[in-house]
């Protein structure tokens, strides 16, 4: 349970807590027991526990005791067009804790061509000084350049990073070609990394954006129109196909449409190691808001891939999440203020992309999935915490209520009603894409590193109390299957005798130079070949002929042609 970090926090490790009378919910079992926490770890689980004196006791009164949520898709302090997203690491992680999430994995987004290592250190320093909860970092590969392989090796071997995101969209900025994706997947598999993919067809999006702007459509609806779900689905299919040829796991971030989700579900049935992550937004709302008459409201929903304009999509994605076709829920939390969004008031392609969700994620999942009977409480723990911990090699330190695991614990009230609104959320932005939603399920108490940070609606945190959690490569949940498949389904040549028969000699093909344009024709116009006049002939009876010296026979009168006479008027 050791970890690397820059600082120690004595006031956290001195806390001793006893949670009494709760019902422990893990991804695979539920049971009644007490839980004793000390030194930031779960020390005992059971009934009639013997604990030291002076321990603070929390009465759960039969309520659920679950592992703290893990949000693996956040963009705090993300740069965009000279701006940064509205919530920094303090504001964002504070909101996360208020919603029951006790760990995040944030995205490092380097400027294209800049050093991955330098960018990682920049993000690490910002998070280390501000984060209120434990955190880790993905590193996004925004360009495939000379020296990137060496930096990736250092990040995996020395910096505790085991996940990297590549982009199939954002043409001329982050987008990789298929051959670059193949190279990146192959190299990252060798490092034992988790490959995250932002899946959209960037080439076609660029064409659609141009076409729609030329039509005079400049508002947020243009964002959805230029990124139809077919372009998300096509890229998902292509990413899975590339990963399948290499036998490497692939994780599709921000699954937003039915089509994309269907492709993931079908692929998993056929065998590829693919994982899908819908976000709170795609589970809790839809893209009809892009057509709102209120520009600021419409712009608040702009994110990529866009929310589906089909209002039945959230329910559909929730069903696939419940049956295991999708495995993890993130938030994609990257909100910008209305003033920042207004940079694109005359051009939808300039609206900075991102929505809120870091605080609302767990409540939205409970309300849409568990309160409707689509999934049970164990599945809820799996898709909000445990599956992420297993995929990103945090398990069982995170994602489980077990002796020895980190004391990141939430007492959850499934019956508590909560209204999602910008008036009370912890994010700094003035809007909330879930505005007015009445939801079942909410945290009563949130414990991070063994310390109570949220209770009775009040949050008590300080900057920098979160720790960086390093992650080792080759997570068993993924790579155990990769190793077995390599042995069972590896490519092998056919053993056969040497061919000793004739071999056709292929003549060397001369290189033909392009003909120079003649003076009579324009070089820009292709001259068609001359057309033969079928009524003309070079045969002539005048003058000397080649057979003039041959002896000629005397003429004979032909009585009838071969086959006898014919009469074209007779059919008999």
Swiss-Prot record:
Protein's name in the database: Dihydropyrimidinase-related protein 1
Biased composition (Low complexity): 509-525
Post-translational modification: Phosphorylation at Ser-522 enhances CRMP1-mediated alteration of FLNA ternary structure and FLNA dissociation from F-actin.
Entry's localization field: Cytoplasm; Cytoplasm, Cytoskeleton, Microtubule organizing center, Centrosome; Cytoplasm, Cytoskeleton, Spindle; Cell projection, Growth cone
Chain spans, region Disordered: 509-572
Residues recorded as bearing Phosphotyrosine in the entry: 504
SUPFAM superfamilies, sorted: Composite domain of metallo-dependent hydrolases, Metallo-dependent hydrolases
Gene Ontology molecular function terms on file: filamin binding; hydrolase activity, acting on carbon-nitrogen (but not peptide) bonds, in cyclic amides; identical protein binding; phosphoprotein binding
Motif (Required for interaction with FLNA): 246-247
Pfam families in alphabetical order: Amidohydro_1
Similarity remark: Belongs to the metallo-dependent hydrolases superfamily. Hydantoinase/dihydropyrimidinase family.
UniProt biased composition (Polar residues): 534-543
Subunit structure, as described in the record: Homotetramer, and heterotetramer with DPYSL2, DPYSL3, DPYSL4 or DPYSL5. Interacts with PLXNA1. Interacts with FLNA (via calponin-homology (CH) domain 1 and filamin repeat 24); the interaction alters FLNA ternary structure and thus promotes FLNA dissociation from F-actin.
Function statement: Necessary for signaling by class 3 semaphorins and subsequent remodeling of the cytoskeleton. Plays a role in axon guidance. During the axon guidance process, acts downstream of SEMA3A to promote FLNA dissociation from F-actin which results in the rearrangement of the actin cytoskeleton and the collapse of the growth cone. Involved in invasive growth and cell migration. May participate in cytokinesis.
Residues with the 3'-nitrotyrosine modification: 316
Modified residues (Phosphoserine): 8, 521-522, 537, 540, 542
Gene source species: Rattus norvegicus
Residues the record lists as Phosphothreonine modifications: 101-102, 509
Location, primary (coarse class): cytoplasm
Gene Ontology CC entries for this record: actin cytoskeleton; centrosome; cytosol; dendrite; growth cone; midbody; neuronal cell body; perikaryon
Superkingdom of origin organism: Eukaryota
UniProt-listed CDD domains: D-HYD (cd01314)
Keywords from the UniProt entry: Cell projection, Cytoplasm, Cytoskeleton, Nitration, Phosphoprotein
Database matches in InterPro entries: Amidohydro-rel, Hydantoinase/dihydroPyrase, Metal-dep_hydrolase_composite, Metal_Hydrolase, Metallo-dep_Hydrolases_sf
Transmembrane segments: none
One GO term of the biological process aspect: neuron development
